[in-house]
From Swiss-Prot:
Protein name in UniProt: Isoaspartyl peptidase/L-asparaginase
GO cellular component, one term: photoreceptor inner segment
GO molecular function: asparaginase activity; beta-aspartyl-peptidase activity
Family: Belongs to the Ntn-hydrolase family.
Length: 308
């Protein structure tokens, strides 16, 4: 089985010119890390965790050290991961003072009988398992501060925009043994209420993986994704015989027509076919397969380079 990894850097209304190349390079790094793990015999779960960790460590993405701020100016993060081999899953929400929530979600999957831990329970579990904590302000970037200030001003001016605040990062993978996995991580939406949880940590919404069907990671307006169970909906369409592209388009179209939500999907199936689709203005993505690295940000913007 030829391994495949696909990553995304979140749906976006726009990416400024000064950030676009940094975002592209970040996505390429994440896909390359995930692909190298697979080529060295690592599992799909290892690959998606590794790829998402790269993006959590990159301040240009809304996850980990680049997370947006809640209305109190604090970082609260969500993440989830799933193994398509046995449907085991791990998720965390509203976690603070941790650089890599996806690593904590992996531990929930591997070391507890549960699927989901939140807030103080997640924090105590992290401490008990040696996950290092960092000062909360160390996760706050100047860009995040400015975004919060701008959002508060626009909220006061009553200028809602369903395309804003869509950032999430995610990965899906197929390993050499034919196993599938997904991982998704986010800082949520700018100026959210403390304790708000979106789609990202919710299995079936923020992602899903089943060796018999495929793996999905989603991005977009979290409340909209939750209402339609976007990830599992996409795989339902695959089960009904649709191609990955048809399934992604149908699911995103349903979300847009039912709740006016926009977002994006990355998918890979058990045959190693992959797809990326979005209805937001842009979505940074990269896919590695057969020694080739495909990537793009905007509609019609696709490049392919050799991995050597």
């Amino acid at each position: 089985m030829n391994p495949v990894v696909v990553v995304h850097g979140g749906g976006a209304s726009n990416i400024s010119k000064d950030r676009k190349e940094r975002v592209r390079q970040g996505i390429l790094r994440a896909a390359t890390v995930g692909y190298n793990i697979l080529k060295q015999g690592g599992s799909a779960v290892d690959a998606v965790e590794g790829a998402v960790t790269v993006l959590e460590d990159d301040p240009d993405f809304n996850a980990g050290c680049g997370s947006v701020l809640n209305e109190n100016g604090e970082v609260e993060m969500d993440a989830s991961i799933m193994n398509g081999k046995d449907l085991s899953a791990g998720a965390v929400s509203a976690v603070r003072c941790i650089a890599n929530p996806i690593k904590l979600a992996r531990l929930v999957m591997d070391k507890t009988p549960h699927c989901f831990l939140t807030d103080q329970g997640a924090a105590r579990f992290a401490a008990a398992n040696g996950i290092p904590t960092i000062p909360g302000q160390q996760l706050v970037t100047e860009r995040s501060r400015k975004r919060l200030e701008k959002e508060k001003l626009e909220k006061d001016a009553q200028k809602p925009d369903c395309q804003k605040n869509l950032g999430t990062v995610g990965a899906v993978a197929l390993d050499c043994q034919g196993n599938l996995a997904y991982a998704t991580s986010t800082g949520g939406i700018v100026n959210k209420m403390p304790g708000r949880v979106g789609d990202t940590p919710c299995v079936g919404s923020g992602g899903y993986a089943d060796n018999d069907i495929g793996a999905v990671s989603t991005t977009g307006h979290g409340e909209s994704i939750l209402k339609v169970n976007l990830a599992r909906l996409a795989l339902f369409h695959v089960e009904q015989g649709k191609s990955l592209e048809e399934a992604a388009n149908a699911s995103l179209g349903h979300m847009k027509s039912k709740v006016k939500g926009v977002g994006g999907i990355i998918m890979v199936n058990k045959a190693g076919e992959w797809a990326v689709k979005w209805t937001s203005t842009s979505m940074p993505w990269a896919a590695a397969k057969d020694g080739k690295l495909h990537s793009g940000i905007d509609f019609g913007d696709t490049s392919i380079i050799d991995l050597s």
